[in-house]
């Protein structure tokens, strides 16, 4: 499962259901990872009908709080209320379902 770090503010907004999208810059680093999980074709275009589970972790430690989110992808401008820079184009992860991971 692809794991992506996320800031606490956005983590909490996704967990509460307030934030419905997560944004990642249009960089080769993310393109490769999204291709591997099936959200992007090797041409760089989103596979609209595909959804996959991604782990969003609030920090870099394996013990940091994390969520599993079922996502689909599009390439678009983001919502500035949810952390996107105005007018900038992103990989937009549309969040369909959220599961909080419990640590023992």
PLM segments and residue spans:
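Catalytic phosphate/metal-binding cores of nucleic-acid and nucleotide-processing enzymes, i.e., regions
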Residues: 1-104
């Amino acid at each position: 499962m692809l794991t992506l770090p996320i800031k606490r503010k956005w983590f909490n907004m996704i967990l509460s259901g307030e934030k419905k999208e997560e944004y990642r810059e249009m960089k080769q680093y993310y393109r490769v990872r999204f291709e591997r999980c099936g959200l992007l074709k090797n041409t760089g275009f989103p596979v609209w009908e595909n959804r996959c589970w991604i782990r969003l972790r609030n920090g870099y430690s394996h013990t940091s709080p994390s969520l599993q989110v079922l996502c689909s992808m599009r390439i678009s401008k983001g919502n500035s209320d949810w952390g996107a820079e105005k007018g900038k184009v992103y990989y937009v992860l549309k969040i369909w379902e959220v599961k909080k991971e419990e640590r023992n």
